[in-house]
């Protein structure tokens, strides 16, 4: 059976672990006849063929042609329907050397298995009713998780909280459609139809659906991450802060102006938000053509940032009694939220710090975070402030612990359902014929079905599973 680019039933095999030296490697199989086919390369073929589901065997992988031992392995046996894919399945757990993992995989391919497509195991779990699309997508979320919060969000969807939330809304929407159908079928039977349908019934569905749509805005930054740019004039301390946040010496630190001529990138997280952090060239006019390119890149990256940490040298502010005009204009005109960071805190006394705060307040710039990258003072406060700004910018200070969305695809489907329901609600208030309103309600129900996979197309399935790695 063929669904989109995937077929069902035929035996497939894939390497499920990274191809690099490791303690263990896993080669997995699934499909009709998988147990019998796998027994052809196992030292105890009869035991494997007769093994019960959810059992483990110990033995060797043998090359059927040369009869030579390949590796000592543990074999996990699953019988349909009680497996991840819902099919018979065998997994070989071997030593994790690249050559031995590839050898076992090639032996399986030579003995009747087909190479699996990316995401094909999870697709089969979906097609065989072992998981809906929200759970299938959650599998990929967990694989790609970068922080504990990523894992927590994905685990909630994997456990079925989004599926349950959608099913509850679909149940309520189905009841509204049924109520409208009663009035359509029995317009003159007051005892049967009167009061069965009202616009308020639609409104009661719109509200939780709005909350669900809003959950993506609040959560996507925890899933997709944020782009945080360190900006400021030369020698403001950007590279020192870059190193301090990473807790390693990645960027060259020098008193020479224009040392950083291009951007550096590193990954970290601010209290659970995955961040791509960029150290950029100092912003200044320069006749050095190479440095000028770096400056332009700094400005471009700042325009595309989710958050800018704009660094200022306190000596310049104190000596001038004001913030440099270019710095002030950058902070006030930036498209992204800006946290003003005053560096070299270890060189400032209390009076100087308060003076700087007063100067910035007079120029209507939010209170800065004052740090010392050298002494690590203020770094924690800066990280917490960055988290607060990034989370607030999504419209939430955290994330939903109940049903919540985990992908753009899910958000788009919810928004389409919401748009149709709002139209239906408005039309019902204006007295449109009920049969037209029911058409809108049924369309909304179809959009919600796309989220769980109850309503599906090849395009939807390709969109969901194309991002999966081979072996999952």
From Swiss-Prot:
Record-listed GTP binding positions: 235-240, 254-260, 279-282
Entry EC no(s): 3.6.-.-
Q: Which GO terms describe its cellular component?
A: cytosol
- Binding of Mg(2+), residues: 239, 260
Enumerate the spans annotated as TrmE-type G domain: 225-391
- Provide the binding site for K(+): 235, 254, 256, 259
Tell me the domain of life.
Bacteria
* Gene Ontology biological process terms in this record: tRNA methylation; tRNA wobble uridine modification
Keywords attached to this entry: Cytoplasm, GTP-binding, Hydrolase, Magnesium, Metal-binding, Nucleotide-binding, Potassium, tRNA processing
> Which EC class is this protein assigned?
hydrolase
Which Pfam families has this protein been placed in? MMR_HSR1, MnmE_helical, TrmE_N
Location in the cell reads:
Cytoplasm
Q: What GO molecular functions are on record for this protein?
A: GTP binding; GTPase activity; metal ion binding
Details of cofactor binding: Binds 1 potassium ion per subunit.
Which residues participate in (6S)-5-formyl-5,6,7,8-tetrahydrofolate binding?
28, 91, 130, 472
InterPro entries xref list: G_TrmE, GTP-bd, GTP-bd_TrmE_N, GTPase_MnmE, MnmE_dom2, MnmE_helical, P-loop_NTPase, Small_GTP-bd
Q: Which cofactor does it need?
A: K(+)
Family from the record: Belongs to the TRAFAC class TrmE-Era-EngA-EngB-Septin-like GTPase superfamily. TrmE GTPase family.
Assembly notes: Homodimer. Heterotetramer of two MnmE and two MnmG subunits.
Q: What PANTHER family does this protein's entry cite? A: TRNA MODIFICATION GTPASE GTPBP3, TRNA MODIFICATION GTPASE GTPBP3, MITOCHONDRIAL
Q: Any idea what job this protein has?
A: Exhibits a very high intrinsic GTPase hydrolysis rate. Involved in the addition of a carboxymethylaminomethyl (cmnm) group at the wobble position (U34) of certain tRNAs, forming tRNA-cmnm(5)s(2)U34.
Cross-referenced HAMAP family, in alphabetical order? GTPase_MnmE
Question: In its UniProt entry, what is this protein called?
Answer: tRNA modification GTPase MnmE
């Amino acid at each position: 059976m063929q669904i989109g680019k995937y077929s069902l039933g035929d035996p497939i095999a894939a390497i499920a672990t990274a191809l690099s030296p490791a303690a263990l490697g896993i080669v997995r199989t699934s499909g009709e006849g998988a147990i019998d086919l796998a027994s052809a390369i196992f030292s105890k073929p009869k035991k494997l063929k007769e093994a019960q589901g959810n059992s483990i065997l110990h033995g060797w992988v043998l090359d059927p042609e040369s009869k030579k031992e390949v590796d000592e392995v543990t074999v996990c046996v699953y019988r349909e329907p009680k497996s991840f894919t819902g099919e018979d399945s065998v997994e070989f757990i071997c030593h994790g050397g690249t050559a031995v993992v590839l050898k076992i995989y090639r032996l399986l391919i030579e003995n009747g298995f087909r190479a699996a497509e990316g995401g094909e195991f999870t697709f089969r779990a979906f097609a065989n009713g072992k998981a809906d699309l929200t759970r299938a997508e959650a599998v990929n979320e967990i694989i790609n998780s970068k922080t504990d919060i990523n894992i927590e969000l994905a685990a909630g969807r994997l456990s079925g909280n989004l599926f349950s939330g959608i099913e509850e809304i679909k149940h309520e929407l189905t009841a509204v459609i049924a109520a409208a159908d009663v009035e359509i079928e029995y317009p003159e039977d007051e005892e049967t139809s009167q009061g069965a349908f009202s616009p308020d019934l639609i409104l009661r569905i719109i509200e939780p659906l709005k909350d669900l749509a809003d959950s993506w805005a609040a959560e996507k930054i925890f899933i997709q991450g944020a782009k945080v740019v360190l900006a400021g004039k030369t020698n403001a301390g950007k590279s020192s802060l870059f190193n301090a946040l990473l807790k390693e010496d990645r960027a060259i630190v020098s008193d020479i102006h224009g040392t950083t001529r291009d951007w550096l990138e590193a990954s970290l997280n601010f209290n659970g938000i995955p961040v791509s952090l960029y150290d950029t060239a100092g912003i200044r006019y320069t006749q050095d053509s190479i440095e000028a390119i770096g400056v332009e890149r700094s400005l471009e990256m700042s325009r595309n940032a989710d958050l800018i940490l704009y660094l200022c040298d306190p000596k310049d502010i104190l000596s001038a009694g004001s913030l440099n005009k270019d710095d002030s204009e950058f902070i006030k005109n930036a498209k992204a939220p800006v946290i003003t960071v005053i560096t070299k805190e270890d060189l400032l006394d209390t009076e100087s710090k308060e003076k700087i705060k007063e100067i910035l307040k007079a120029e209507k710039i939010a209170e800065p975070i004052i740090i010392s990258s050298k002494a690590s003072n203020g770094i924690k406060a800066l990280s917490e402030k960055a988290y607060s700004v990034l989370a607030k910018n999504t419209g939430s200070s955290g994330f939903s612990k109940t049903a919540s969305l985990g992908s753009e695809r899910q958000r788009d489907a919810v928004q389409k359902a919401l748009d149709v329901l709002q139209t239906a609600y408005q039309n019902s208030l204006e007295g449109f014929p009920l049969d037209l309103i029911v058409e809108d309600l049924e369309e909304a129900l179809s959009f919600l079905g796309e989220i769980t996979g109850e309503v599906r197309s090849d395009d939807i399935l390709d969109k969901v599973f194309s991002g999966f790695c081979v072996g999952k």
